[in-house]
Amino acid sequence: MCGDRGSRTAPSAPSVDGAVRAGRPGVRAMTTNPPGTKPAYSMRIRVRGPAAATVAAVVADAPGTITVHSDESDPAGDRRITLDADGGPTLRWLVGALRQRLGADLLLAEDLVFAAASTGKLVQRACAATTTSHDLALSDADADRRVIDYLADHPRHVDRFTGRSRRVALLTDASAVLDFEPLAPEAALPAVESQALHLHLATGLDVVPLPVAARDPGDLATAIALLAPGFAATVLVHTHLHRVDAARAALGSESHLLLDTVNDGLAVAATAAVLGYLRARGVTPGRARVAVVDPARGGDLAGMLVAVGVGDLTLYDPVEYGIQALHRLAADLDLIVDLIGLAAPPPGVFVLRARPETPPPLAAATRGPRPLHALPGLLRAAVTTRRPITSKARVAAVHALVAATPPGALLPALDHPRLAPAVAAAAIEVLAAGR
């Protein structure tokens, strides 16, 4: 549901050298990218047909790795070429070299990351007809007055006669956005809009990205409570865990559905990856020896591992014990769950990388956990049953993920069409039973 350039003009986006124009990104399937390059450092150019040879020469001279992702001719005989670089320095060099060597033959250059960001990634669409005067009257004051009058007497029917049941607030206070220090809320929008896009695609729900200026957990809880009447559920994303926990505590027994990307996403997916790894090696959970490095970063991950039956669980604080003690411990372990991003993990033992700030690429998420493995299904379950997610529902989601994982992988692919429905069905069964 990206914006249509025919109906919307995207603002000029900053480029790697300050002059690359914004445009509309191409749509890509979820396929693995060539090694050595990163689509997050990509550009699309349009050049006159004969200039394609010069582009090839520039790519060959690059100081880093550049791959030609696509190369197509248009009806005018011009060439549209998408180039992926291995990082910022190579991309900056590429832009400068193309401008210098192509001159007027370079008809367009756009940074695909900023082009995609400038669309907002999601747009609203009208559901009610507005073609005739009769259509318009159904969304005018007299019609609204009738529905409001009814809902004032039947408040439990709000979800039946409004769009609230399909609407989700994706909230952040920008306190934990990727590797950044706390940000101004609006600066978090690109990350929140991306998450809204993926959640919408996986659930079909209308997901609204909402950065909020919350100075402390109390402000965050207040924002959630103030917005709750308009949404079926709220999902906290890119928000520090201690603020998530404090906001939950402040809200208390409020009936509004509140999920977060760590407890209802990453922790569930990481637990499923642990079980998948143990299963592939013929180790039963009860006999497994697992260490979680920096467990405070994983939300209820430790509780989830205990709940699925891991028999020997070590919670390892690298600040208190350092790294050498972990190396000495490694020989007795089946697996390490790394939540901090160990620079030199112990050899000889499998390390599951699960640092929240550095998730695996979407197209390679069969090798490591992402919140999107579990969160869409659990969100669907919560909205469908109108019940908060419980520990038992998360455990059911873990087993659904394990069952959907193909041989040789730790987790199912994120674009598996039955992934979210399978997780949702497992959680709904538990929630509907009141567990």
Q: Which ranges hold each PLM region?
A:
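Glycine-rich phosphate/diphosphate-binding loop of Rossmann-like nucleotide-binding domains
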Residues: 178-203, 264-338
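Intrinsically disordered, low-complexity segments enriched in serine/proline and basic residues
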Residues: 9-14, 18-23
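Phosphate/diphosphate ligand-binding glycine-rich loop within oxidoreductases
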Residues: 171-172, 179-180, 217-265
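Rossmann-like adenosine-cofactor binding region
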Residues: 324-365
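A conserved regulatory-domain signal marking ACT and ACT-like small-molecule sensing domains
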Residues: 2, 26-114
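Helix-enriched interaction subdomains in cytosolic or periplasmic regions
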Residues: 113-146, 246-256
